[in-house]
A protein has these predicted regions:
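Beta1/beta-strand and adjacent pyrophosphate-binding region of the FAD-binding site
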Residues: 1-13
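Hydrophobic anchor at the start of a short beta-strand
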Residues: 5, 26-28, 137, 152, ...
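Glycine-rich FAD pyrophosphate-binding loop
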Residues: 10, 22-44
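Predominantly flavin-linked oxidoreductase catalytic cores and closely associated redox partners
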Residues: 10, 34, 108-220, 233, ...
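N-terminal FAD cofactor-binding segment of flavoenzymes
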Residues: 35-84, 151
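FAD/FMN-dependent oxidoreductases across multiple families
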Residues: 73, 199-278
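Active-site-proximal substrate-binding core of FAD-dependent oxidoreductases
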Residues: 233, 237, 271-309
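C-terminal auxiliary extensions adjacent to catalytic cores
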Residues: 300-341
Length: 341
């Protein structure tokens, strides 16, 4: 008989688990220290990748019983790839390369969509409360430490919808910056993997670069920031507790596309508690290989510098010319192989 399940954290991983468990008759209680799901975000845009599986992720969500129509998303098949020497090329695919969603507490945000799914399924969410981890079966709390930081600015603009991704060691040492514009709202963000002095200046210089190369007509709204913790634990079930999402180190080390891993791990944890699968095995077989590859790729990217970034960008475009699909390069980059195990 289904019993009570306590989940620590009302983010995407915790709420995906809560939805499935509640729908299958479990008495689900989600405990969140913040006052709402998505409260740690400031309305910034993030991407859900679509290249680590041959199955479209939204279709996979539907197969699990999760409804991607509960939140706003914008699909992209093309991106501006900005080389270190300011050349701009365009990886493109016939399908969906990734989707952009908004994080936060507004009704259309993905966090609120997952909250609605969990509540509709019958889960109880306790906001503004603390719960001891040893009293929970699923640990879905966000990052506690910070091994990467991001600085961004949200602004009004009359520019068309676009996503631009930039490899430039001077603006984002060892990492990347990006521009996202959705329906008149833009976000310019620089991500830093190395510890830097006066980190704010990198954002200022990044904004200046994008203003010079894109007609943004930018009207600033606010500046935002975020952090991520990237580590690979020894195990994902400890004393009966399932560690999901960032709490379990299930994150994309290379370019920070962690939402797919978060949602997937929450689903795996729910299925494990229901007796349908073994969480430890599912994570190690399906997610850990991707995460290890992304960690090795991040290690290499952190040491390339602009000459290396230029080589990567050029190879990406040559690969697209050969394969006829820019998404194939990203699939290759994330595939475990003999040289990256």
């Amino acid at each position: 008989m289904p019993g009570r399940v306590d989940i620590l954290g009302a983010g995407l991983s915790g709420l995906s688990a809560a939805t499935i468990l509640a729908r299958n008759g479990y008495d689900v209680h989600v405990h969140e220290v913040r006052q709402d799901s998505g409260a740690r975000f400031d309305g910034d845009f993030q991407g859900i990748e679509n290249w680590t599986s041959d199955v479209d992720f939204f279709e996979e969500m539907r197969q699990w019983g999760l409804d991607p129509d509960e939140f706003k998303s914008d699909a992209f098949s093309i991106v501006d790839l900005i080389h270190p020497d300011d050349e701009i090329t365009n990886p493109i695919t016939d399908g969906v390369a990734f989707r952009v969603v908004e994080r936060g507490t507004d009704e259309h945000c993905i966090d609120q969509g997952f909250k609605k799914m969990a509540l509709d399924a019958g889960a109880t969410i306790h906001y503004g409360t603390r719960k001891e981890p040893n009293e929970c079966q699923i640990i879905a709390a966000g990052p506690k430490d910070s091994s990467a930081v991001a600085f961004g600015e949200i602004f009004h603009t009359d520019h068309e919808n676009i996503v631009a991704f930039q490899l430039n060691d001077k603006l984002a040492p060892g990492a990347y910056s990006y521009l996202i514009i959705i329906d008149g709202i833009g976000l310019i963000c620089t991500c830093l993997w190395r510890q830097q002095k006066k980190s704010g200046r990198y954002l200022n210089e990044t904004i200046a670069w994008y203003e010079e190369h894109y007609e943004l007509n930018r009207k600033p709204i606010k500046r935002v920031g975020g952090k991520g913790d990237f580590s690979i634990p020894d195990r994902y079930i400890h004393d009966g507790r399932h560690y999901v999402g960032e709490a379990g180190g299930l994150q994309d080390f290379m370019w920070g596309f962690g939402m797919r891993y978060a949602i997937t791990s929450g689903v795996y944890a729910a299925h494990s508690i229901m007796g349908q699968s073994n969480y430890e095995k599912k994570v190690r077989n399906h997610l850990v290989p991707l995460i290890k590859v992304s960690a090795i790729n991040r290690f290499l990217m952190n040491r390339l510098g602009d000459r290396g970034f230029k080589m990567v960008a050029n190879y990406w475009m040559r690969h697209q010319a050969r394969k006829g699909d820019g998404l194939e390069f990203m699939k290759w980059v994330y595939q475990p192989g003999i040289f990256r195990r």
